[in-house]
A protein has these predicted regions:
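FNR/FR-type flavoprotein reductase catalytic core
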Residues: 1-128
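Local cysteine-cluster metal-coordination motifs and their immediate loop/turn environment
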Residues: 100, 124-149
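Short Fe-S-cluster ligation motifs
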Residues: 135, 140, 151-164
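Short histidine
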Residues: 34, 61-64, 140, 144-147, ...
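Short acidic, gly/pro-rich beta-turn/loop elements at beta-sheet edges
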Residues: 42, 131, 155
Length: 164
């Protein structure tokens, strides 16, 4: 499993990460990439302080604007998977964060060998009414509120660079 989160995108992934950690024997290799614009934008700082010392997984952290006490690297979240270099064999990558981060993370995962079916993201930012009536959340022929908000890259790849 590979979790890639940017900014507040760690919030929806955190419970999934903890579930994987609580049931570690059921999963293979685990990589977590998390980053934010600045130290003030980091969420779950206690986890971020303890996770890098946890030998059950690899952790890579990035900040767009550096900080004195930051343990990770400078840069943008989409570059993180390249640093961790996760194996795509029998793996799934879960991506959650700002739209621009999501858009630029998929090509990097693709270069690492992940297929569009192995890449999962959530697009709830697009939802408006939440019941499929307003049509504002459509992406191609899909409605985020009805068909998602979780999608594989295979489902949205033809639309994500144009509309998201």
């Amino acid at each position: 499993l590979v979790f890639v989160a940017g900014g507040i995108g760690l919030a929806p992934l955190r419970s999934l990460i903890w579930n994987v950690l609580d049931n570690r024997e059921d999963y293979g290799k685990l990589d977590i990439v998390y980053g934010a614009r600045s130290p003030a934008d980091l969420v779950y700082k206690y986890d971020l302080d303890t996770w890098p010392t946890d030998d059950r997984f690899n952790m890579a952290g990035t900040l767009a604007r550096g900080a004195d006490k930051w343990q990770g690297t400078g840069g943008f979240v989409p570059h993180g998977p390249g640093e961790v270099a996760p194996s795509a064999q029998d793996a799934v990558a879960v991506v959650c964060g700002p739209p621009i981060m999501i858009r630029f993370t998929f090509p990097i995962l693709d270069k690492l060998g992940f297929t569009p079916e192995q890449m999962i993201t959530t697009l709830e930012k697009r939802m408006k009414c939440g019941i499929g009536k307003c049509g504002r959340c459509n992406i191609g022929n899909l409605y985020v509120c009805r068909d998602g908000p979780v999608f594989t890259y295979a489902q949205i790849k033809d639309f994500i660079s144009k509309e998201y």
